[in-house]
Amino acid sequence: MISVPIEYYLVVAAVLFLIGSIGFLLRRNLLVLLMSIELMLNAVNLTLVAYNRVHPHDHAGQIFTFFVIAIAAAEAAVGLAIVLAFYRIRKTMRSDDADLLRS
């Protein structure tokens, strides 16, 4: 069995988180913003699972990953509902136009 060092997992997780952060900061489409947040959460999940490789008898990484996935699913559902409601009202997906609190 080939053993992959923990550093590889952490580098991949850091790259995923960086891509998600850049996508969140540079893009203006609300759907792309949601996908960037999900990408960052998946990077966190990869880090938590990599923690389990270092501590194989401690299942905290897998348990936290399960909770993060459950919360991410709820966040995606609520976020998509908000984006759809915003699109119905404004007919646009740009986050710059999200000034509904300003009349």
UniProtKB/Swiss-Prot annotation:
Q: Report the transmembrane regions from the record.
A: 6-26, 30-50, 66-86
Tell me its EC number(s), please. 7.1.1.-
Against Pfam families, the record matches this protein to:
Oxidored_q2
User: What does the record give as the reaction this protein catalyses?
Assistant: a quinone + NADH + 5 H(+)(in) = a quinol + NAD(+) + 4 H(+)(out)
* Molecular-function GO terms, alphabetical: NADH:ubiquinone reductase (non-electrogenic) activity; quinone binding
UniProt KW keywords = Cell inner membrane, Cell membrane, Membrane, NAD, Quinone, Translocase, Transmembrane, Transmembrane helix, Transport, Ubiquinone
Identify its membrane topology class: Multi-pass membrane protein
What biological-process terms (Gene Ontology) are attached?
ATP synthesis coupled electron transport
Query: What Gene3D superfamilies does the record tag this protein with?
Result: 1.10.287.3510
Write out the function statement from the record: NDH-1 shuttles electrons from NADH, via FMN and iron-sulfur (Fe-S) centers, to quinones in the respiratory chain. The immediate electron acceptor for the enzyme in this species is believed to be ubiquinone. Couples the redox reaction to proton translocation (for every two electrons transferred, four hydrogen ions are translocated across the cytoplasmic membrane), and thus conserves the redox energy in a proton gradient.
Family of this protein? Belongs to the complex I subunit 4L family.
The protein, known as: NADH-quinone oxidoreductase subunit K
Which species is the source of this protein? Answer: Sorangium cellulosum (strain So ce56)
Gene name, please? nuoK
